[in-house]
């Protein structure tokens, strides 16, 4: 998905895997639909935004292509593998951690939006949309 918005070769996420923390860098593949002519964009996030959605939001945020609006994300920056022990017993093991291109750990509290929506003060679910529209019309 990130390849649709980011130039070819842009670092989307850094993965550190294994006991030696081998770094695997994941980059875009160059299908950039907008070819640098991306209109203003807002990405809405909340505590339910996890894993791949955090990776995409973080990549767009760090590249300056989107303003992230909402509340801090879940913080699911880990990769698990399922090891079958028996037919009825499995063990889920964390085998890697994800970091944004700039080295921000997705697991450490999730992503912080550029514009925070105060959920306590929100009068309706439209508060999220109102915040996004305000960013887009400034």
Show the residue positions of the predicted features.
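Gly/Ser/Thr-rich loop/hinge elements
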Residues: 1-51, 78-83, 99
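Solvent-exposed, polar/charged alpha-helical surfaces in well-ordered, non-transmembrane soluble domains
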Residues: 3, 39, 54-58, 62, ...
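Flexible glycine-/small-residue-rich
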Residues: 45, 95-97, 119
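C-terminal recognition in membrane/secretory proteostasis and scaffolding
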Residues: 117-138
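Gly/Pro- and small hydrophobic-enriched strand-loop and loop-to-helix capping segments
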Residues: 66-76
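Extracytoplasmic
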Residues: 6-8, 36-41, 51, 55, ...
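Generic structural signal for well-ordered beta-strand positions
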Residues: 106-107
């Amino acid at each position: 998905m990130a390849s649709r918005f980011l130039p070819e070769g842009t670092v989307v996420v850094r993965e550190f895997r294994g006991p030696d923390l081998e770094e695997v860098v994941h980059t875009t593949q160059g299908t950039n639909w907008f070819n640098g002519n991306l209109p203003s964009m807002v990405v809405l996030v909340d505590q339910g935004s996890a894993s791949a959605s955090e990776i995409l939001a973080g990549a767009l945020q760090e590249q300056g292509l989107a303003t992230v609006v909402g509340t801090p994300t879940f913080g699911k920056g880990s990769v698990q593998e399922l090891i079958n022990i028996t037919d009825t017993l499995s063990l889920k093991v964390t085998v890697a951690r994800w970091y944004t291109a700039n080295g921000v750990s997705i697991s450490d509290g999730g992503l912080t939006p550029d514009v925070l929506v105060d959920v306590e003060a929100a009068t309706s679910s439209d508060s999220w949309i109102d915040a996004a529209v305000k960013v887009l019309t400034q």
